[in-house]
Amino acid sequence: MELRARGDRLILGREVCYNPLAVFEVAMTEDSMGRALLAITMGDPAGVGPEIVLKALRHAVVYRRCRPLVLGDRRILERAASWVGSPGLEFDVVDDPAAGRYTSGAITLLNLTNAPPGECPTGQVSAAAGRAAVEYVFRACDLAMAGAVDAVVTAPLNKAAMNLAGFAYAGHTELLAERTGAPEVSMLLVGPKLRVVHVSTHVALAEAIRRVTRARVETVIDLAHTSCLALGISAPRIAVAGLNPHAGEGGLFGDQEEREILPAVCSARARGLNVSDPQPPDTVFLRAVKGEFDVVVAMYHDQGHIPMKLLAFDSGVNVSIGLPIIRTSVDHGTAFDIAGSGQAREDSLLAAIDVALQMVAAHGTSAY
């Protein structure tokens, strides 16, 4: 497959400049079966997910690059269509992904009819919306596991709504890990000039510190390596952030670097991986942005998320790594405060679609 760049974008390999509204076109045959099939979940019905899905799929280039299958509720999408200036939008409702038309101007939809609008008020947490959002992810995951779709791209769900519905997951990654039986997973963030993998994510800071163990750090270094390979980066250069200020300063400010992190680094090096010593957290991300490293292993959620949000608030992508399926997502939440206003931007979802397609291409697969 020949790639032609148009504008700045995230491409396979080390170049990571991305402008999601100037997505490059892919030279391919006219045969629609040459396009990867992506399952795109609608997200929480009460949030901005339905709006950004519809906005993203207004870009004709998306259909030239892939076959997007939306998993959601037609009633919610029709409600959102009026907010984003697309009243009367056509829906191609299917029961089987193989039956979809996947043409620009019509939304190919697997209609789960599980989100009655009256039970999913816009901008509000509800058990009905939380349950529906989880069911979209379950169905998309099952399709990917069965090989019926090439990858899963998720719009945001709301953790409070999800838990109110009885699903005690910290987020998409944990949900998908259980659904697929994946033993070791982590979160990869991909942004305009930075990639970050986390040792821990949605836990209290005290618990995050306890989770900085040699075994876990070594596992995440391995996940960082394989995630870069999945993005087409050969021989990735991996930076490892320290936990403490100045990476412990030789034990003056904490000993986790010498006791847990450095042994994990040495073990990874012994297996041929290109991994740095524990680096001062306040400078390692800048060095990665300047091109010295391909990915940074962050020790906890905010250590990795703060630089990513600063650099890529609208265009960051969340990738679940360690799963037997490809899953990417927007790097923002349900934004209840603007849901229903039509203001939500689709940039991050376009970026998530782009990264999913890169991973499918690197993996060399396409659904039927």
Predicted regions and their residues:
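Ligand-binding beta-strand-loop-alpha-helix segment within the catalytic cores
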Residues: 189-211, 215-218
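Extreme N-terminal basic, low-complexity initiation segments
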Residues: 2-10
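Short, flexible loop segments at boundaries between secondary-structure elements
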Residues: 179-194, 323-337
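Glycine/threonine-rich beta-strand-loop-alpha-helix active-site module
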Residues: 164-186
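Contiguous, glycine/small-aliphatic-enriched amphipathic segments in soluble metabolic enzymes
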Residues: 15-172, 215-299, 303-328, 332-334, ...
